[in-house]
Amino acid sequence: ITAAQVNNGSSDNCSIDTMTLDQTDFTCADVGPNTVTMTVTDVNGNVSTCTSTITVQDNINPTAICQDLTVQLDASGAGSITASQVNNGSFDNCVITTLALDKMNFTCADVGANTVTMTVTDINGNTGTCTSTVTVQDNVAPIALCQDLTVQLDASGAGSITAAQVNNGSSDNCSIDTMTLDQTD
């Protein structure tokens, strides 16, 4: 700021030589009210001072930058991410205090592409958002459990079985889609 911006009609019976401020530059550390002293000096060296309250505001939202991410489900069918994994260099003119995601935990119901929103908040409460595509993958193979089976042949000498008859409690971290046999008759 300049003394001219703070001056509210200073005068002298002769003439004013200089007007100076004890602080002219402000940073994020100065957000809020600041007392600034203006010193007015006339051509004869006489000095007078006054104070003014300068309120510094940070109204600039952080710039949120997201990156896409892939998450693998574990053996229990769960996966999670953190905001720092989604963050791709978000920045602010002051200081970022929090990164938050609207969804961090994923299950088998989320397999595929999911849109996640990250909110970046700065020290003065300003926010910025971005979205990321989080691709959830289930790469855990099912556990196939089989049981022995005795098949009685019919009068024509044929017999058949189903996968359900051979299954002995097979499982998967998500769910079993299909069970097949390589030979059924």
Annotated model-derived regions:
Residues 1-185:
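Proline-threonine-serine-rich low-complexity tracts
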